[in-house]
A protein has these predicted regions:
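Catalytic core of Fe(II)/2-oxoglutarate
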Residues: 57-110
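Short, structured patches in soluble enzyme cores that scaffold and shape functional sites
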Residues: 9-13, 31-34, 42, 76-78, ...
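Catalytic core of non-heme Fe(II) oxygenases with the double-stranded beta-helix
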Residues: 14-70
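A short linear-motif detector with a strong N-terminal bias
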Residues: 8-12, 18-19, 50-53, 79-86
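Signature of the catalytic double-stranded beta-helix
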Residues: 1-9
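A residue-level signal for beta-strand positions that form part of recognition/binding surfaces
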Residues: 6, 29, 100-102
C-alpha cells in the first residue's frame, strides 16, 4: 500500500481548551517543542465516559500528557483494520503570549 504524508510545523495560541477528539488520519507523529504537551485519555476512561471523545467531563486524575520534547505516535480513525480505535486527545490551553510550537507528521494509507 502507498502512504501519503503531511508534515506541519505550527504555533497554537488559544485561550480556550480544545475538546477531546480523534484525528482523521491513520497515524500522527507529534512533538511539542514549546509549551504544554498534548493531553490524552486511556481507552478505559473513554469506555466509561461519554463514548469516545467530544466531552471534557473526565476526572483530572485520568488525564495523561505527552511530555514536551517527546515524540509520540498516535493512531487515528483511519488506522488500517482497526477503525475508530484512535487515541482520544486534545491540545491544552496556550495563551497568546506563550504559544505552543508543534511538529506533526500525518500518515494515511491509500
Amino acid at each position: 500500500p502507498q502512504a501519503a504524508l503531511r508534515v506541519c510545523i505550527e504555533t497554537r495560541a488559544c485561550n480556550e481548551r480544545e475538546r477531546f477528539h480523534v484525528d482523521h488520519v491513520a497515524l500522527r507523529l507529534i512533538c511539542t517543542y514549546r509549551g504544554q504537551g498534548t493531553q490524552w485519555l486511556p481507552a478505559h476512561v473513554i469506555e466509561t465516559s461519554s463514548g469516545g471523545g467530544g466531552s471534557d467531563a473526565v476526572p483530572a486524575s485520568m488525564l495523561q500528557e505527552i511530555p514536551g520534547g517527546a515524540i509520540a505516535v498516535m493512531k487515528g480513525r483511519r488506522y488500517p483494520d482497526q477503525p475508530d480505535s484512535g487515541l482520544v486527545h486534545r491540545s491544552p490551553m496556550a495563551g497568546v503570549d506563550s504559544p505552543r510550537i508543534l511538529a506533526m507528521v500525518d500518515i494515511d494509507f491509500a
